[in-house]
Design a protein with these regions (language model features):
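Beta-lactam-recognizing serine transpeptidase/beta-lactamase-like catalytic domain environment
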Residues: 3-52, 57-184
């Protein structure tokens, strides 16, 4: 059994490594470098928008900070919600209406609205400090250099909508896949 070992890092689309050993024509080299799918780009080293994979992290932060009561019913808002008119035309949307709107069901239905509300309850200070404790904005201690995960382009959550979007893994949240695996 393997513990705490990275057995493989995968980036797709890929190319045949043997082409480098056998010698590659300039045409093949140019084709690889000009391919719009960028097979030479190491995606596992980059950061990506985590989307719904981030919701359990928000749940853990909310429970740890006491901002979320797992049995509190947030009420069914339908498929679109905004905190108030200060958000202008911006709405958070979700795919499923269900009841009761509690943490367990929000995870089952992957409810963006619930997690946007949860992020607002957590607040920017607790969100920033919790994500910093989880290694955001830090270099991963790994033999291969990885891009740093971030919760904001400026290292600060500056707007309420940004905080709400962070609750469901959107906004300016970017996470390295290896970092996400380590957090889980």
């Amino acid at each position: 059994m393997y513990k705490r070992q990275v057995l493989a890092l995968v980036s797709t689309p890929s190319y045949d490594n043997n082409d480098f050993i056998r010698g590659m024509s300039s045409e093949k080299w140019n084709a690889l470098n000009e391919d719009e799918n960028k097979p030479m780009y190491n995606r596992f080293r980059q950061v990506w928008c985590p989307g719904s994979t981030f919701k359990p992290i928000i749940a853990a932060i909310g429970l740890t900070t006491g901002a979320i009561d797992p049995n509190e019913d947030y009420g069914n808002e339908g498929l679109s919600w905004q905190k108030d008119s200060s958000w202008g035309s911006y709405h958070v949307t979700t795919l499923h209406a269900y009841e009761p709107v509690i943490l367990k069901n929000a995870l089952i239905y992957s409810d963006n609205i619930y997690f946007a509300k949860a992020a607002l309850k957590i607040g920017e200070n607790d969100m920033e400090s919790s994500l910093t404790k989880l290694g955001f904005n830090d270099v991963l201690p790994f033999d291969i250099k990885m891009a740093k995960s971030q919760f904001s382009n400026t290292e600060k959550i500056e707007k309420e909508i940004q905080l709400a979007d962070s609750g469901y893994g959107q906004g300016q949240i970017l996470v390295n896949p290896l970092h996400m695996a380590c957090i889980y």
